[in-house]
Amino acid sequence: MSSAPATNYKVADISLAAFGRKDIELSENEMPGLMYIRKKYGPSQPLKGARIAGCLHMTIQTAVLIETLVALGAEVTWSSCNIFSTQDHAAAAIAAAGVPVFAWKGETEEEYQWCIEQQLFAFKDGKKLNLILDDGGDLTSLVHEKYPEMLEDCYGLSEETTTGVHHLYKSLRDGKLKVPAINVNDSVTKSKFDNLYGCRESLVDGIKRATDVMIAGKVAIVAGFGDVGKGCAMALHGMGARVIVTEIDPINALQAAVSGYQVAPMDEVASIGQIFVTTTGCRDIITGKHFEQMPEDAIVCNIGHFDIEIDVAWLKANAESVVNIKPQVDRYLMKNGRHVILLADGRLVNLGCATGHSSFVMSCSFSNQVLAQIALFNADNKEFREKFPEFAKTGPFDVGVHLLPKVLDETVARCHLDHLGAKLTTLTETQAEYLGIPEEGPYKADIYRY
């Protein structure tokens, strides 16, 4: 991507841009969905005139997402949605390519808020955003609460995560949501791939890089058995751990039980767990009473979204002392004489202690994000929707929380198959008539659960 460096940015070290560029080029080959979108929609410039404020982990994979948005005509500003998840060479490369980015690994909470606000005022000629691309809801909340005037000409927002989607639905119920929102998280090619298969690989990567501990034979407690929890349980079991699942939902608990996992409350298993992983998106999953029960050098980490799943504040206030072993690895001495090892300060372990999900699975997620941004920006563009019939059902949007249509979900899946050498079977006309579906899809009803 060739353009002048951004004049308004803040990254850790701009000299890392060349390193970041090499990594971006390597990832592009592993992100066929985004490359397909650039090739198919690029000539039409469907995001020309869009001003997208993005708040999402500033990684190499996100750099490919950003450059895809730019290739489609958008002006973009960026911040990270997590204080530890930025890859500094990725941020440098994006700044050097001309995108105002405000992100570095190891931000303070104050710096994190500063970065999000700075991006809002970094568009050319002092213009305001007209689209939001969010991960977790912090940017959405900031604009709604502090800068509501920016929503007057905003086409809408797209949200990446389970946590952020929960906040959107709550905001809608409370009458506080002011623009249309697309729930990217619940696209099948996001939740069933990023959340499950992505976490299945990146959780263990984070734990291993942080601790070098052998997982085989250990008791691992996985809090939550949604898609993220399923992926984590599979990964730990595959490494030889004895996995115990905690759940509030009887359906998820039953799924865990018939998958071969013991299901029990945290209060009952905290004393035997050697590795603890929270995946719920809820607060107070691991609290002081659990820390006090844990065996020596229990490893505690989170792969939900925010750091409130683990009561880190209690741990810091009540531990006798703490020793920083290495970045994002802290060993706390408890008053009972035992130690607890906390990873990534209770934030996302796969991004804080490793590099997050692989490029390929993020291509699935980010393809949905790009399609959502296109859909929002062109919701009233009848000519565009006639030219690209896959967008025929994407608008106009009312204020509310919407899903992308099944045809776009299938498009995302389809454009990743060649990379894996997978070939589809084609329905015959007779078969399609028998099933009552079009030969070219969509193949499943919206209520189908994959």
Swiss-Prot record:
Cofactor note text: Binds 1 NAD(+) per subunit.
Residues holding substrate: 59, 135, 160, 190, 194
Gene name as annotated: SAH1
GO BP terms: one-carbon metabolic process; phosphatidylcholine biosynthetic process; S-adenosylmethionine cycle; triglyceride metabolic process
GO CC terms, sorted: cytosol; extracellular region; fungal biofilm matrix
A Pfam family it matches: AdoHcyase
Name of this protein: Adenosylhomocysteinase
Cell location: Cytoplasm
InterPro entries named in the record: Adenosylhomocyst_ase-like_sf, Adenosylhomocysteinase-like, Ado_hCys_hydrolase_NAD-bd, NAD(P)-bd_dom_sf, S-Ado-L-homoCys_hydrolase_CS
Cofactor field: NAD(+)
Main location: cytoplasm
Domain of life: Eukaryota
Residues binding NAD(+), per UniProt: 161-163, 195, 224-229, 247, 303-305, 350
Main function: Adenosylhomocysteine is a competitive inhibitor of S-adenosyl-L-methionine-dependent methyl transferase reactions; therefore adenosylhomocysteinase may play a key role in the control of methylations via regulation of the intracellular concentration of adenosylhomocysteine.
Catalytic activity reported: S-adenosyl-L-homocysteine + H2O = L-homocysteine + adenosine
Pathway participation: Amino-acid biosynthesis; L-homocysteine biosynthesis; L-homocysteine from S-adenosyl-L-homocysteine: step 1/1
Family label: Belongs to the adenosylhomocysteinase family.
Gene Ontology MF annotations: adenosylhomocysteinase activity
Keywords assigned by UniProt, alphabetized: Cytoplasm, Hydrolase, NAD, One-carbon metabolism
Record has NAD as a keyword: yes
EC numbers on record: 3.13.2.1
Other comments on record: Has antigenic properties. Elicits a specific immune response in systemic candidiasis human patients undergoing malignant hematological disorders.
